Amino acid sequence: MIPARLHRDYKGLVLLGILLGTLWETGCTQIRYSVPEELEKGSRVGDISRDLGLEPRELAERGVRIIPRGRTQLFALNPRSGSLVTAGRIDREELCMGAIKCQLNLDILMEDKVKIYGVEVEVRDINDNAPYFRESELEIKISENAATEMRFPLPHAWDPDIGKNSLQSYELSPNTHFSLIVQNGADGSKYPELVLKRALDREEKAAHHLVLTASDGGDPVRTGTARIRVMVLDANDNAPAFAQPEYRASVPENLALGTQLLVVNATDPDEGVNAEVRYSFRSVDDKAAQVFKLDCNSGTISTIGELDHEESGFYQMEVQAMDNAGYSARAKVLITVLDVNDNAPEVVLTSLASSVPENSPRGTLIALLNVNDQDSEENGQVICFIQGNLPFKLEKSYGNYYSLVTDIVLDREQVPSYNITVTATDRGTPPLSTETHISLNVADTNDNPPVFPQASYSAYIPENNPRGVSLVSVTAHDPDCEENAQITYSLAENTIQGASLSSYVSINSDTGVLYALSSFDYEQFRDLQVKVMARDNGHPPLSSNVSLSLFVLDQNDNAPEILYPALPTDGSTSVELAPRSAEPGYLVTKVVAVDRDSGQNAWLSYRLLKASEPGLFSVGLHTGEVRTARALLDRDALKQSLVVAVQDHGQPPLSATVTLTVAVANSIPQVLADLGSLESPANSETSDLTLYLVVAVAAVSCVFLAFVILLLALRLRRWHKSRLLQASGGGLTGAPASHFVGVDGVQAFLQTYSHEVSLTTDSRRSHLIFPQPNYADMLVSQESFEKSEPLLLSGDSVFSKDGHGLIEQAPPNTDWRFSQAQRPGTSGSQNGDDTGTWPNNQFDTEMLQAMILASASEAADGSSTLGGGAGTMGLSARYGPQFTLQHVPDYRQNVYIPGSNATLTNAAGKRDGKAPAGGNGNKKKSGKKEKK
């Protein structure tokens, strides 16, 4: 029989082991530790990392943490050591009052695997509490006729500890009338009773004082005492008795305060005062004493506190009935608190992700919920669901845990955020529910490239635009957000006519506005093909391109260019021949012009602007052909000048002119013969003008000479006064001689005779041009001359076209150096080398003026050419203290003799460093000579 029972027990153990192994594999892992109570904070409970199969450093990496329960956390994880430690005071009596075994349960969550481990911590009792009596002093009344061996119940002691640390024994102080016995209750409690061993005699002793000591079994032993005063009363030999030894009641937890639960009743066979009974609680714990009240006269038990099934579902109390003689009786009261569905489910978010990437796969964990209901049975059974049609679902996890996961792949561009409502409902009547709201943001990922609203763009810009002007704005849209939607614009690299595209246009990387970096020229290129790229700032970045066409619009910025007749480069003028026998409409020549513009800006029209003989020639409006308008007559001049204007049709119109010289003759030799016959009349016509010029020059010279004489007289007077001062004050120190020589006379001379005569073949009269006077206070030194600008520029040294430098001057001709006989002075008797200095006394100045006037007179008659003979010299504005005539440039080239074709040349016949030419080749055009 016994082996069969052992076989069945062994089989049950095997099945239990298999079941426990299965639960372990499914995640319901239980870890057990045992610790004594009252440990210091931070004391080690167990090596949780080892029991989880992890290294201590992996606790933080895997998100291992304790799921909190309640407000007070008793344990914590030490991430360094991987141990479970105490986080506060652990008092077994406070946590597990009266329980034989005190176990604390906690849950540990491993977030990376979403796995929960259960941990049981057994709190071992220590002897930290001494036995105590609720009443330290007790008074017992005993009738004097009480029989021996009569027992009187005494208050029992309380010890919160358990086992051997709990209450073990009672001891009564030595006396002659009483002894102590201990009764063991059904629950293991010990109840002391006072036993009368010797009959009492009130007349012998009315009161007895005893000491009751309660001891536990701890090491060391702890004790508690109570003082007992025994009062001997007059005889009363009947004790009260309860109608039943035990009272039971079952009440719901939602009773109102003051509700009567039950009534206990005890009777005493005595009569009168000895039959009066009073009720009281004999044995009741602290929680029951706060909830229930016993009426001492009626025996009615009612509520004075709220009943809560979740806090305590059962109460056990002991009541006693005592008469006036001290006789008493005891009875038990058992009250069961029935559960009522008065607690709604509680939902605790143990793990919550505030956002989830939009490209997360299905089943991505959003939150971990712990659902609890403090009610029992059906009132504590909870179901959870999500309200609305949302792409999420709840999955049952370990115990009361639910996992909120995604049901589809989310798209932020469609729905950027969700408000999730999780409803937990119990099965009670009526059912109670709790709603938990979860706000979830869908994090953006860079899954959308920028998009241009148009497939291509076109823009038109007129040429000659200012630099920096905005051309066009392109804008792309990115449905992503934040950095993924921040767009940067750029231009694709390209070359235009060998130059980089970036030298023509640029784009604002933030706004997409295209700017012109240079002024566009329609004649250079007419369109630009640009590729604009929009790139976002996501990771990885996405981009898109769009084509942009820039069309340059033509402006009328180019004047017509005359191709024929071409402008001469050597100063000569082309001559067209028109035979005198030409009929009306005869084609003399054709003006050919082009315009670099396009459209109507390049439409050209020709017209005759000016003609020396009006009505003789006509110009084709659109062809530019110069034709005779009538027959040529003998009275028509040999030379005909035509000014033809070419104009485009732009707004505003631009034009160009060309001067044509038409010779009315049948051949070139006839042209030359006719020009020779016309020379004498021309000279006769200009003789009057030459006479007027000579008279004007003589008058100006006389005025200048008078001014010089007056100036010299004043300076001589000043010099004479200074000599007198020097003679009278010999102690005065003289100032050193200046390095600069005053040339007031020469200054006046340069001012007076700074003019030029221009004679052209186009005019019947010669023109005398007087430029603005050029003043100078003193002659500058040779060093300052080399650094400063020249006062007068001759034909040998002129500014270049761009104005940045000077054209090199032809070297001075040695034939222009003065010989000893030619050098100004007193009769030419002064000695010196060939590089004589500038005259520096009054006599030499007068001689210089006379020579200049003589030269002017010789030039006026037109019969001689100034050469290298005596009395000729060249002048220039560049001179200094050590100036010599060798440095004087050839000035004769700027002097034209009125009434003749002669110009000043040197002895070798050179002019401007070129070979001598005919008189007509050296003539200047009227109005074209500009004073530099």
Curated annotation (Swiss-Prot):
Gene3D superfamilies: Cadherins. Its main location: membrane. GO terms for cellular component: plasma membrane. Residues 922-932 have a biased composition (Basic residues). It is found in: Cell membrane. It comes from Pan troglodytes. One of its GO terms (molecular function) is calcium ion binding. Keywords: Calcium, Cell adhesion, Cell membrane, Glycoprotein, Membrane, Repeat, Signal, Transmembrane, Transmembrane helix. Residues 30-692 are extracellular. The keyword Signal applies. Residues 30-133, 134-242, 243-347, 348-452, 453-562, 570-683 form the Cadherin domain. Glycans are attached at residues 265, 419, 545. It comes from the Eukaryota. Residues 714-932 are cytoplasmic. Residues 816-841 have a biased composition (Polar residues). It is a single-pass type I membrane protein. This is Protocadherin gamma-A12. GO terms for biological process: homophilic cell adhesion via plasma membrane adhesion molecules; nervous system development.
